[in-house]
């Protein structure tokens, strides 16, 4: 079972929603954030280094304190206000004509520590520490984490009934993605949502492993500092948007490599033929069509690579992943890149940028070869999380990203 609760969300009045809401902190750099931030943008709170000239070190104490000052200022100005009642919220995102509906809720940090909230990625200590400082200083979860839950017909019915009413927010962001929010403040409905989730065996971290880990660390820290801790304090809970697993789509997460590890192009292609059926496609962009089929761009030409049977293990939840197949048979075996986390010879490109970004980076001379992968499925992600396994680095890319500042959870 998982413990969730409604909460008094801190959020912008309707007239400010589109301006306050921003892209999440980790999808744009400081220069981009400074250029993108308008007066009321949440970027001033989640990337406060942009308020210094020149842009300050994002990990400096003055920047962390500026975030606290800005959050306070936004509330004083009325750009963020706290709801009077504890609520759940329905948050809808529309991309390319397709809409997914998530429930905005608070989850209990101990469910993450116990494994009821399941992860599929490792976290980096430095990023985890950075997020923890933000949460601790703000006494708030400014940005939500992105969870999935097993489909539930009764929750679907509650969501459908809710979204049949006019939305509280309805705006289209600069990236053309649509965002809508509905408020569920009926006590009986809120109570029923809580009861249903108490029967759900697990939630799955889709995106936001560092924010989840940081929230859990702050919860544990507050517990340790409170001799009268009961487990129901507001600091025990953190902000999440949870979607039914069937509505989520993972898009491709691709690789570009700087060199061929001393091989000529002819030697490299010959080495690939040990484990792949290699087909030259030509100048037209080639998109992978199935699991174990890869797209490669080399010297102005696209190729189809299909892993031969026997080169992967369909019964191994990690070994069957295309990121594992590519890493084992190409990146490590041929190109000598053993550790994706530390190698400076490889970079990763989210599929939202399109395959044209791969050819652009190779044609520019920055990179030598590019690989596009068939996307991981939600079922693969859940199987890996359920078996306690960890996906290789840079495996999943979810789109659209949650907009930050639609709803905030304060535990002040």
Regions found by a protein language model. Give the residues of each.
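Surface-exposed, charge/polar-rich loops and edge strands
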Residues: 1-412
């Amino acid at each position: 079972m998982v413990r969730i609760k409604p909460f008094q969300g801190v959020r912008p009045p309707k007239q400010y929603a589109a301006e306050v809401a921003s892209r999440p902190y980790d999808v744009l750099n400081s220069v981009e954030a400074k250029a993108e931030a308008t007066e009321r943008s949440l970027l001033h709170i989640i990337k406060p280094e942009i308020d210094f000239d020149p842009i300050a070190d994002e990990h400096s104490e003055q920047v962390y304190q500026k975030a606290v000052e800005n959050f306070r200022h936004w509330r004083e100005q009325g750009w963020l206000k706290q709801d009077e009642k504890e609520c759940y919220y329905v948050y809808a995102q529309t991309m390319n004509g397709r809409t997914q509906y998530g429930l905005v809720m608070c989850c209990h940090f101990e469910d993450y520590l116990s494994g009821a909230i399941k992860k599929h990625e490792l976290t980096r200590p430095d990023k985890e520490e950075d997020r923890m400082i933000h949460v601790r200083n703000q006494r708030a979860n400014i940005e939500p984490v992105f969870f999935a839950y097993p489909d539930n017909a009764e929750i679907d019915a509650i969501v459908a009934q809710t979204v049949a009413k006019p939305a509280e927010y309805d705006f289209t962001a600069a990236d053309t993605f649509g965002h809508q929010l509905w408020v569920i403040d009926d006590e009986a409905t809120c109570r029923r949502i809580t009861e249903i989730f108490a029967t759900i065996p697990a939630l799955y971290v889709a995106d936001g492993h560092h924010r989840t880990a940081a929230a859990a660390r702050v919860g544990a820290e507050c517990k340790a500092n409170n001799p009268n801790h009961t487990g129901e304090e507001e600091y025990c809970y953190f902000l999440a948007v949870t979607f039914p697993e069937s509505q989520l789509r993972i898009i491709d997460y691709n690789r570009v490599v700087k060199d061929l590890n001393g091989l000529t192009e002819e030697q490299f292609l010959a080495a690939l033929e040990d484990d792949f059926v290699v087909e030259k496609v030509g100048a037209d962009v080639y998109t992978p069509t199935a699991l174990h089929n890869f797209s490669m761009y080399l010297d102005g030409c696209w190729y189809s690579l299909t892993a031969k049977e026997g080169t992967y293990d369909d019964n191994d939840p990690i070994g069957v992943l295309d990121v594992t197949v590519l890493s084992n048979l190409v990146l490590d075996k041929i190109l000598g890149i053993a550790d994706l986390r530390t190698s400076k010879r490889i970079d990763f490109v989210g599929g939202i940028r399109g395959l044209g970004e791969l050819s652009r980076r190779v044609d520019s001379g920055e990179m030598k070869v590019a690989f596009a992968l068939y996307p991981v499925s939600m079922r693969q992600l859940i199987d890996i999380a359920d078996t306690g396994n960890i996906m290789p680095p840079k495996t999943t890319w979810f789109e659209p990203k949650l907009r930050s500042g639609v709803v905030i959870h304060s535990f002040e």
